[in-house]
Amino acid sequence: TFYGYEVISPSGNFNYSVSYLFNAGPFSHTGFKLDYAASDDLSFMFALTNPHGVTSGANPSNDYQYGFQTGYKGQYFNLAYGADGFGFTDVLYLDYTGGFDLSDSFFLGINAAYANSSDADGGYQGVALYLQNEFSETFSLGLRPEMFIASSGSDDATVSAFTLTGNLSLTDTLKIISEFRYDTSDDMIIPGFPTDKNMSGATIAAVYSF
């Protein structure tokens, strides 16, 4: 998909675990897109795709999703509207993805998103920051603070997450990712922990890319 900051493969992300914004989707699109580069800095993309919930085979509903992206100097605004493949046909997704090199070694990435559907009477909104510092050619450390709000009717439920990640590159294709993550929600919407307000976990992963 053209939408969002993170991707499915862990080799393409700095953090090993994914954000709430990523889990909210869309994950992928099947269809047609047209890319146009107006200059070295400015680009546009137009798309007509199946609903992102339709991941294989034919599209039985003949409902579609329309996509648009504009990018300027590494900052991207994304829009998707239409059917989601889960029974709703008026879902609007808005997304900003970008980042800035604040110094030779420090990078700030930003992802902000909003989604809403009158059919579903719900949606979500959230923001995640990606603070990453390169200490050497082989080791980087990053912090991803995130806030996510899920809406349903007149009710909102909020969850925040803080992820500290270290990346150690052993070779050009193999890296070790060590991570500590803390999730907190007074509304108890942490996935897999429906009765808990707080959750913490640690992960060590070897990621090989080819």
Q: Where do the model's predicted regions map?
A:
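Outer-membrane beta-barrel "beta-signal"
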Residues: 72, 168-170, 180, 196-210
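Transmembrane beta-barrel domains of outer membrane proteins
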Residues: 33-35, 45, 69-71, 99-101, ...
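Transmembrane beta-strands of outer-membrane beta-barrel proteins
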Residues: 43-46, 73-77, 108-110, 141-143, ...
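C-terminal hydrophobic structural anchor segments
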Residues: 138-186
